[in-house]
Each structure stands twice: as structure tokens, then as C-alpha cells.
């Protein structure tokens, strides 16, 4: 009954809350009542006064953002690496796009391009001097685009799910060459907060707050003249509902940035859900993070193909608890038809036997996935060079350098990877060091690299037969007790075959990758306690969070049985008959924890003893005592 009253008050007070919000942004009211307090309170009539807003101000990059301390607008500080990397990628994308138009961008902290002096012939020097004089005489000056200024020929950016507007404001303050940035969100609270933060950072000339459904907003910009040059999608969970609209609303050759935080689905914990959202079956394997990237790329390309468009991956990152892809979208019927060759589907794969030829187990089939390179190494090199030349631009520059360095070392034409612990645990042997396994592959004339998605990954073009031969040779140096292996186990089947390749585990100098030698920050340690995906933003604010925490505490271990003491356990075990006592082999006697009592024979109701005395007896009354032969 009390819950229904609170809901009724919430509906009656909604117009009052909207009026208070409007007065605040017009500057007529110095303070804004807490929406959560007004929803859970009694209104302005008098019983309970609204509480003041408790806000938190954070500084990230060049932006300063104020947001409610209660969980009314989503914000996760752990994703600062995601936002820093996005700013770096869009900056290089703007450099490429505007450079084709003769516009040079200026990034704070970057040094001016130095002229390189080269040896020229006298005739070439005269031509260069004449050309420079002509340019100076005509008065043509190179056009530039600076940070925080409107570039009429610049990029039109959309952030479909802006929340507090932090990402859009950082674009306006840190990325040069922008024409406008649309910060959209479907929540009225979030849009009000975006407006306030835009005014706080003085970027109203660049950032345009918008309250609309992200899908409808993108569908309304399908015309070629209205499309966005950059679309950034960072939803809470899966971006699948927004992909169809996004591939239509991005301009020709435009940049599409997509984040997926539903890694439990993409990593194979729910194959049916993954197929319904992305059109592919995920495998629960050690290479699940790279497979998640390839599933997302396949899903993007599949949706773009419906509109005679296709995607070209620039950068694909698996970090922390999410994956992030940066792709360019183009139009072309011929390329769309070629997309059928850059995805692998289990239905059209090479013919194989029902069981694996190496371990004897059944195959795991997944996909379809993107089978082509997931990075543009030239573009990655440009981003890496820009971040390395200006390390003070981002707070996570050190990690960006490390991750991008590992990506440049990856084998682009080798999908997925193995892991050291996976190989050694399969045959139950000791794990070789990373340098030993890499050296053995290099000695056998195979290529090998790391993967940014996993710390102990081995990405190689060696076939599975050669890799298992190397592991068989390693097992001979650290023998496994064969008598303990089951004849049907994968370890027994693999080790029962003699290796055809003699592995050489001598350490090679080129086995140690450059990023490892330089000690770059390649893999992130836990940034803070209880880090990871944050809970969804709720209108109830902090009160709702406290109620949810209390509910979690009360339901903790609800399905688990209470622990039993020794007496309860002994009594429970005495209800089970002892199997060895039945066989006559139990030697524990009364010390046995199971029952030695003979089982009580069950007498059916139809089995009446053939005895004249019993047949002449009258039925027993309620007061009669129990007699032998009746009970």
C-alpha cells in the first residue's frame, strides 16, 4: 500500500519538477531541487521540503563535468582510456579528412612540422624558389583548424548516448577541425545535465544538446547532405539496436565508433543471445575476446551490406570489460559482393571429420565472424606516432602507446590465437616460457606474435599439427606420468603420437618482442577496487542504490543450504544403508557412519497371510492395543 502511494505522488509532482528544472537553466533559481527527493517526497505543498542537489565535479582531459552524486546519470571513470583513445583516433581521422581539403589541424602540445633539407639540383632549387615566390605573391596562406574553433568544412559529430556529455565536451575541447557536435540522450535528466556542462565548459558554439531516441535521430539523418562524419555509440550493454541506423546515418567514408560492454554474451556464455543480437554464435574459448571483436565487425558489415555499404576496420580494441571498434563506412556494390569472402561461416567451411584428428574430441563450431585483418596498421601507426610525440595530451598516453605497439606487432592475417596455459593444460605438462615457445616456432620457420587481447597469447601461422609436435617435444623434457592418463583423454591421444618435427627451444633474440623489451604498459592492472561495469542509471538516485544494496545483502546466499554441524551430518548419513555391509565386507562395525540395520520388508496390501486365526479376527478398534501380526 505504501508503494502505491509513492508512485501516485511521483505522477502528481512530475510537472512541478519540470518547472523547477526550467527555472534553473533560465537563471531565475539559484538551486535545483533533487529530482529523486521530489519524486519520493510530498511536493511543494508543505509536508516535506525538497533536499538540495548533491553534485560531484570531476576533471577529465580538458573538460570539467558536474553530475549528481546519486546514480541518476551514468558515468564510469574506468573508461577514461576509451575516451582518450577515441579523441586520438578522431584527431587523426580529422587530419586525414581535412588534409585532403588543404586544411591543417593544430593540436595543443604538438610541435610544428620541421622542414627537411635535402640535396636538390640547381634546376630543382630554382623551381622551388619560383613556386614559393608565386605562393607568397598571391597571398595564399595555409588554412588551419584549431581546437575549440568552428571549422566550416570540418567534421559533423554525433554522440548518440551522451549521458553527462563528457565525451562530446572533450571532443569540442581537444579535437580540432570540428564543425559541430550533437550530444544526444533520451533521458531528460541527462539532457539537462548536458546543457549545464556545456555552459560550464563554454562550448555552446560547438556542442548542441539533443533529447531524442538515438535510433530515430540517426534515421532522420539518412540523406547524404545530413549525414554525420563521425558517430560514436557507447551504450550500456549491447549496441545491436543502434547498428542498423548508424550504418545509414554515417557519411561516405565516415567514422563509426562502437563500444560493446556485453562481454558475457560475446564471450560465449549465452550463444543463443549472441546469435539473436549479432547474428553469430560465440565460442567459449580462450580466444573469446578477439572472437568478440570479429563478431562485432561481422555484425556491422552485415547491416551495412543491406544498404549497399561495407565497412573497413581501422582499429579494434579489447580492453578491460568491453570491446571497441573504429570502422569507416563506404558505398559500393562490388565491394559488398566481396564481403561474402571476408567472413567465415561454419556452414561453408572446409570438410572435416566429426572428431578432431589430434585430440579425438568433437569440434566446436561458431561464427560467422570477420576473417580479414581487424586493424589498419598504417592508421594505427599514425595514431601511435601522434600520441608518442605528445605524451602530455592524455592521462592514459602510456597505456595507449603500449596497446597500440602490441597491435602493430600482431600478425594481421592470422585470426584468433592460442594461450600457453591452454596448450600445457591439455597435455597435463609444465608450461613453457613465452620466449621458449616463440623461439621454437621461429626455429621452425613459422611466424609468431602476441595479441593485445590476452597477455599469454600466441598468435602464429603454424598449423595445429606443428604446434602439437612442439608441445610433444616439450613434454619429453618434462615427462608426464602416462599411467595416470585415461586412454580416452585428449592428453593420452596427443602424446601417443611421436612428433615429426624436432623442436629447438634455444632462445632467439627476435623472440622477445620490441614492446616487451622497452617495458611498455601493454596490459592494464586493476585500476581501482570494485572496478568494472557500473550499474545502470536510475531515476531513484542514491536512495534506489541503497535499497538495491540492502536487497542484495538480504538475498546473499539465499539459495544455499545453511551449514550443518557434525551431529546433523552424522544423523543424515545414518539414514543411508552401508553398501559394504550388504556385501559383508564392512569392517568398521558400529564406527561406520552409514546404517547397518537390515532393511524393513514392505508388505503389500494385497498380500494377506493365509492363516485361519487372522481371518476370524475382528477389526481392531481405536482403543485396542497393537497386537503382533497386525502392525
Locate the predicted segments by residue.
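SAM-dependent transferase fold signal centered on methyltransferase-like domains
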Residues: 2-631
Amino acid at each position: 500500500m505504501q508503494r502505491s502511494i509513492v508512485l501516485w505522488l511521483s505522477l502528481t509532482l512530475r510537472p512541478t519538477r519540470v518547472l523547477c528544472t526550467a527555472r534553473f537553466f533560465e537563471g531565475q533559481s539559484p538551486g535545483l531541487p533533487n529530482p529523486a527527493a521530489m519524486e519520493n517526497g510530498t511536493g511543494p505543498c508543505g509536508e516535506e521540503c525538497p533536499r538540495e542537489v548533491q553534485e560531484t565535479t570531476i576533471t577529465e582531459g580538458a573538460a570539467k563535468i558536474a553530475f549528481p552524486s546519486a546514480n541518476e546519470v551514468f558515468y564510469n571513470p574506468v573508461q577514461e582510456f576509451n575516451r582518450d583513445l577515441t579523441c586520438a583516433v578522431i584527431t587523426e581521422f580529422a587530419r586525414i579528412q581535412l588534409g585532403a581539403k588543404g586544411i591543417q589541424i593544430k593540436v595543443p602540445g604538438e610541435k610544428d612540422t620541421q622542414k627537411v633539407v635535402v640535396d636538390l639540383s640547381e634546376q630543382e632549387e630554382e623551381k622551388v624558389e619560383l613556386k614559393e615566390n608565386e605562393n607568397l605573391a598571391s597571398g595564399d596562406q595555409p588554412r588551419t583548424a584549431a581546437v575549440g574553433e568552428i571549422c566550416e568544412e570540418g567534421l559533423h559529430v554525433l554522440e548518440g548516448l551522451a549521458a553527462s556529455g563528457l565525451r562530446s565536451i572533450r571532443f569540442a575541447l581537444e579535437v580540432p577541425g570540428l564543425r559541430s557536435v550533437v550530444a544526444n540522450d533520451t533521458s531528460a535528466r541527462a539532457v539537462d545535465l548536458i546543457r549545464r556542462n556545456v555552459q560550464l565548459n563554454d562550448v555552446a558554439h560547438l556542442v548542441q544538446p539533443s533529447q531524442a531516441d538515438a535510433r530515430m535521430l540517426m534515421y532522420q539523418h539518412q540523406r547524404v547532405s545530413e549525414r554525420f562524419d563521425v558517430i560514436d555509440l557507447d551504450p550500456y550493454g549491447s549496441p545491436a539496436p543502434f547498428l542498423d541506423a548508424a550504418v545509414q546515418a554515417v557519411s561516405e567514408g565516415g567514422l563509426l565508433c562502437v563500444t560493446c560492454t556485453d562481454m558475457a554474451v560475446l564471450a560465449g556464455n549465452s550463444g543463443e543471445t549472441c546469435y539473436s543480437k549479432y547474428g553469430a554464435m560465440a565460442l567459449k574459448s580462450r580466444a573469446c575476446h578477439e572472437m568478440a571483436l570479429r563478431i562485432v565487425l561481422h555484425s556491422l558489415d552485415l547491416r551495412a551490406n543491406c544498404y549497399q555499404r561495407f565497412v573497413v576496420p581501422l582499429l579494434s580494441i579489447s580492453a578491460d570489460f568491453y570491446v571497441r571498434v573504429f570502422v569507416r563506412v563506404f558505398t559500393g556494390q562490388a565491394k559488398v559482393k566481396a564481403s561474402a569472402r571476408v567472413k567465415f561461416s561454419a556452414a561453408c567451411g572446409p570438410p572435416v571429420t566429426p572428431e578432431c584428428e589430434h585430440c579425438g574430441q568433437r569440434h566446436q563450431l561458431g561464427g560467422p565472424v570477420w576473417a580479414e585483418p581487424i586493424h589498419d596498421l598504417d592508421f594505427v601507426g599514425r595514431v601511435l606516432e601522434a600520441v608518442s610525440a605528445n605524451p602530455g595530451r592524455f592521462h592514459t598516453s602510456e597505456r595507449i602507446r603500449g596497446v597500440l605497439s602490441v597491435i602493430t606487432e600482431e600478425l594481421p592475417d592470422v585470426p584468433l590465437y592460442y594461450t600457453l596455459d591452454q596448450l600445457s593444460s591439455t597435455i597435463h605438462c609444465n608450461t613453457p616460457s613465452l620466449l621458449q615457445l616463440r623461439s621454437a616456432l621461429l626455429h621452425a620457420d613459422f611466424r609468431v606474435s602476441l595479441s593485445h587481447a590476452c597477455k599469454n597469447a600466441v598468435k602464429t601461422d603454424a598449423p595445429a599439427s606443428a604446434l602439437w609436435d612442439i608441445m610433444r617435444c616439450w613434454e619429453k623434457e618434462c615427462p608426464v606420468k602416462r599411467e595416470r592418463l585415461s586412454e580416452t583423454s585428449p592428453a593420452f591421444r596427443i602424446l601417443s603420437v611421436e612428433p615429426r618435427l624436432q623442436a629447438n627451444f634455444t632462445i632467439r633474440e627476435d623472440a622477445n618482442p620490441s614492446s616487451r623489451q622497452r617495458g611498455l604498459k601493454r596490459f592494464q592492472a586493476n585500476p581501482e577496487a570494485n572496478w568494472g561495469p557500473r550499474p545502470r542509471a536510475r531515476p531513484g538516485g542514491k536512495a534506489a542504490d541503497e535499497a538495491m544494496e540492502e536487497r542484495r545483502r538480504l538475498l546473499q546466499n539465499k539459495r544455499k543450504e545453511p551449514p550443518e554441524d557434525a551431529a546433523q551430518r552424522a544423523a543424515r548419513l545414518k539414514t543411508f544403508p552401508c553398501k559394504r555391509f550388504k556385501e559383508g565386507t564392512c569392517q568398521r562395525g558400529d564406527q561406520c557412519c552409514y546404517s547397518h540395520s537390515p532393511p524393513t520388508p514392505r508388505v503389500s496390501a494385497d498380500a494377506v497371510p493365509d492363516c485361519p486365526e487372522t481371518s476370524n479376527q475382528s477389526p481392531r478398534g481405536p482403543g485396542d492395543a497393537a497386537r503382533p501380526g497386525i502392525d
